[in-house]
């Protein structure tokens, strides 16, 4: 099943992929499709390998190539994206159900929130990770670390505490 969407753009006769929705390892620049050469971005180097009609996007992390996902160029109907999005946002087996996941990039850094903790990755430095102990810490991180205005809601603290208590804090 297809649950992810890339944009294919042709600029000056050269095809590029653009991906703005892959979370923590999202490429932070368009990537040329028709080369297997290593491509620099403001963050990690990436490469796209091709095997027949199948492409694989990889990122170099700590000197190792890491497979992110595979894709092809088969056109997708809008309804296919609707069904895929519905599945990942509602099916009990979806890795996104019951989760709070946030990612943000900036010059030379990536910040992610998930699994009850925060990770900060800076280019050329060791990653930093820390747990979020309670709902107040999660809300403060969303506001200060990610620039998200968190609206007041009577059930918000309880929902975050339930998420933290469900095992979300097992790893950062």
Residue ranges and their predicted role:
Residues 5-8:
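Short beta-strand scaffold segments in enzyme catalytic cores
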Residues 1, 12, 17, 23-32, ...:
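Mixed-charge, low-complexity segments
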